[in-house]
């Protein structure tokens, strides 16, 4: 289902844990990491599609989360031709998305990447709020920045201040330039002293594995389903 400009209606999900870190999933059998997302089926509202995708990709039910906010308007990105099936080229241009910010009300063990027989992710981790901008595939970076920026104002006040600090130049991609105690990989968190250290807390859902560094592999995103691109 495409609009007249060739964009497929889609929803994106930013899921927060109790530490206001975001869920980050590794697409199955690839080195590509992203937020949960998926197309809106005919007859669905964006919120209905969001809850369906939440269950299909992460295994969570509506009672596991609280809807904090959503973006006001559609956010669009174009998908390069090399990532589009040949039979869709010339018709499919990209995605237009409504993004939802959700708070996890349950526990890590409620997440299940094998909730359906067509899983989207085979590993996951919690990251600081802005870290995904450093590792998401290039053509999605703009829409990720728009969504994260618009929804950041709904974070708790203290977390807003902390994220402004991280966003202003101390994001993990750049941290290796600041001294011997800094780090460069996603999923690490600042120590109170001002240096950076590994956060050892990581729980995996059923059937998942853990890739400790999503930046270690080349991003290869081949999408048989345009709704996931």
UniProtKB/Swiss-Prot annotation:
Matching entries from PROSITE patterns are given as: NUDIX, NUDIX_BOX
Carries keyword Hydrolase?
yes
**Pfam families associated with the record:** NUDIX
EC number(s) from the headed UniProt entry = 3.6.1.-
Q: Is-annotated flag, keyword Hydrolase?
A: yes
Instruction: Identify the HAMAP family for this entry.
Output: Nudix_RppH (MF_00298)
What name does UniProt use for this protein? Answer: RNA pyrophosphohydrolase
């Amino acid at each position: 289902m495409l609009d007249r400009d060739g964009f497929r209606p889609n929803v994106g999900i930013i899921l927060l844990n109790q530490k206001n870190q975001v869920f980050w999933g590794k697409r199955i059998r690839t080195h590509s990491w992203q937020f949960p997302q998926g197309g809106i089926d005919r007859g669905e509202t964006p919120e209905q599609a969001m809850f369906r995708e939440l269950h299909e990709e992460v295994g969570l039910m509506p009672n596991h989360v609280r809807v904090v906010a959503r973006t006001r308007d559609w956010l669009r990105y174009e998908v390069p031709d090399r990532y589009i099936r040949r039979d869709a080229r010339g018709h499919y241009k990209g995605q237009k998305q409504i993004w939802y910010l959700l708070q996890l009300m349950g526990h890590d063990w409620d997440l299940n990447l094998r909730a359906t027989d067509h899983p989207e992710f085979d590993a996951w981790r919690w990251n600081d709020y802005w870290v995904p901008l450093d590792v998401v595939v290039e053509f999605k970076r703009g829409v990720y920045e728009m969504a994260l920026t618009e929804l950041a104002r709904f974070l708790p006040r203290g977390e807003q201040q902390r994220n402004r600090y991280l966003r202003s130049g101390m994001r993990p991609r750049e941290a290796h330039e600041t001294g011997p105690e800094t780090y460069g990989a996603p999923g690490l968190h600042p120590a109170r002293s001002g240096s950076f250290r590994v956060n050892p807390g990581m729980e995996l859902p059923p059937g998942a594995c853990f890739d400790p560094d999503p930046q270690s592999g080349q991003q290869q995103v081949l999408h048989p389903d345009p709704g996931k691109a």
